[in-house]
């Protein structure tokens, strides 16, 4: 039987994984500049963590979650997104306590799981990098979060970016808009998709996010939530826009944007790209917003929050250029089998001194070893044969210049760095 990876998954192979490591390293560095610290949560949670946070009418909960019963007959789900698990951890570990900094800032990275139709940049197991900040409802934090998103994407080389924002207001806003939206949609009830007929009763805002083309035609003339913002919600949104303008972050306001998760309120945003790799049109590569109320929903005290998540697979499509391959600093060639012990001791010492190195493990003849060193693009080749062992020396060749000279093995073992600098800088 030929075993294949599950549909909608990918093997991240050497040559590809280095790019992922590069993205993660850049993200970690920038997050540290903003005082975010890493959090790692389980890849599966009690299913209620997601149904209570994302909303039981959301597509994620109704159609896309991978669920299973454990041996204790508890219903579990592979995490479809990162925020809910982080909020659960925030509440369970009492990270809202007075001993913790406020706002409490964390970031995460790792795999998520949704049962979707696989396509370019969209997998059933996919990866996200995200941030969450708890404890402040200041519009300044909203603006900082968008500034962080912009800095991160630009540092990763993303281009053709468009920032789109909206406000979903506060509970009073949502209540007034809910009533207006139901009044507008009710005459179209029989024309709505089956999913949206259910949403009309349970959560009509979800209809604004419908992927059904006929639903989209109906909601095109729906009321705007921006017309129902309370004075407090309007003031918050106006302040966010002013701050973004002051930061030089261009943005568009899209009153129909609601995001796919029920926990959002006040400021929400998406960052899109129309890069040609997406086949035309704008594709979302980062999105997030405020979720004041979500901590309480999962059993914690009243705590505002804001965050975003970035899809790594989609970002990878924007980073198709070749990465420089990692060159080993040293490759050790053995002329005879008896040199294996000295070679291994020397290679171990070189690595322990912070350098990269390799040797032959395939029993190749010297000619084959030199070919392997060339293929690996080694900077230096160290050769040990019978005469070198007898003299306690090693031949070291600079592969770029072809220069070669002998050094005592003891010097390599004691201070390879000094020899490396001398050989690499020799004219």
Swiss-Prot record:
Any GO CC annotation of this UniProt entry: cytoplasm
GO molecular function term, any single one: histidine-tRNA ligase activity
Enzyme Commission number(s) of this protein: 6.1.1.21
UniProt entry keywords in alphabetical sequence: Aminoacyl-tRNA synthetase, ATP-binding, Cytoplasm, Ligase, Nucleotide-binding, Protein biosynthesis
Keyword Phosphoprotein: no
Catalytic activity, reaction form: tRNA(His) + L-histidine + ATP = L-histidyl-tRNA(His) + AMP + diphosphate + H(+)
Gene Ontology terms describing biological process: histidyl-tRNA aminoacylation
Cellular compartment(s): Cytoplasm
Key word Aminoacyl-tRNA synthetase present: yes
InterPro entries: aa-tRNA-synth_II, aa-tRNA-synth_II/BPL/LPL, Anticodon-bd, Anticodon-bd_dom_sf, His-tRNA-ligase, HisRS-like_core, HisRS/HisZ, HisRS_anticodon
Pfam families xref list: HGTP_anticodon (PF03129), tRNA-synt_His (PF13393)
Domain of life from the UniProt record: Bacteria
Major localization class: cytoplasm
Family per record: Belongs to the class-II aminoacyl-tRNA synthetase family.
Subunit structure: Homodimer.
The protein's name: Histidine--tRNA ligase
UniProt organism field: Lacticaseibacillus paracasei (strain ATCC 334 / BCRC 17002 / CCUG 31169 / CIP 107868 / KCTC 3260 / NRRL B-441)
Lineage of origin: Bacteria, Bacillati, Bacillota, Bacilli, Lactobacillales
């Amino acid at each position: 039987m030929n075993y294949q990876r599950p549909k909608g998954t990918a093997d991240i192979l050497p040559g590809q994984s280095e790019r992922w490591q590069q993205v993660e390293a850049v993200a970690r560095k920038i997050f540290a500049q903003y005082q975010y610290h890493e959090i790692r949560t389980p890849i599966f949670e009690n299913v209620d963590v997601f149904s209570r946070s994302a909303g039981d009418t959301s597509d994620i909960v109704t159609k896309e979650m991978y669920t299973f019963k454990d041996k204790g007959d508890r219903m579990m789900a592979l995490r479809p997104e990162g925020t809910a698990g982080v909020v659960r951890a925030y509440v369970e570990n009492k990270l809202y306590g007075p001993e913790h900094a406020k706002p409490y800032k964390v970031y995460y990275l790792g795999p998520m799981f949704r049962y979707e139709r696989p396509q370019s940049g969209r997998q059933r197991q996919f990866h996200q990098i995200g941030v969450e900040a708890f404890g402040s409802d200041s519009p300044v934090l909203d603006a900082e979060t968008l500034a962080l998103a912009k800095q991160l994407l630009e540092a990763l080389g993303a281009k053709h970016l468009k920032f789109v924002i909206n406000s979903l207001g506060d509970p009073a806003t949502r209540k007034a808009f809910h009533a207006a939206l139901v009044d507008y949609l009710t005459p179209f009830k029989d024309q709505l998709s089956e999913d949206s007929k259910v949403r009309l009763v349970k959560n009509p805002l979800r209809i604004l996010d419908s992927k059904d083309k006929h639903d989209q035609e109906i909601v095109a003339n729906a009321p705007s939530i921006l017309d129902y913002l309370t004075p407090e919600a309007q003031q918050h949104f106006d302040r966010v826009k002013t701050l973004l303008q002051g930061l030089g972050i261009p943005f568009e306001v899209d009153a129909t944007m609601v995001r796919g998760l029920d926990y959002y309120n006040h400021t929400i945003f998406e960052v899109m790209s129309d890069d040609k790799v997406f086949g035309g049109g704008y594709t979302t590569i980062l999105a997030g917003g405020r979720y004041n109320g979500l901590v309480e929903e999962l059993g914690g005290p009243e705590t505002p929050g804001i965050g975003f998540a970035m899809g790594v697979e989609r970002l990878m499509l924007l980073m198709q250029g070749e990465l420089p391959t990692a060159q080993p600093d040293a490759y050790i060639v053995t002329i005879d089998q008896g040199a294996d012990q000295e070679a291994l001791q020397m290679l171990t010492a070189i690595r322990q001194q912070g350098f990269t190195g390799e040797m032959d493990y395939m029993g190749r003849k010297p000619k084959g070893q030199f070919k392997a060193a060339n293929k690996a693009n080694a900077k230096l080749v160290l050769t040990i044969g019978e005469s070198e062992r007898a003299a306690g020396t090693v031949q070291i060749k600079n592969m770029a210049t072809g220069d070669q000279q002998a050094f005592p093995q003891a010097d390599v073992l004691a201070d390879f760095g000094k020899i490396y600098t001398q050989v690499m800088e020799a004219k």
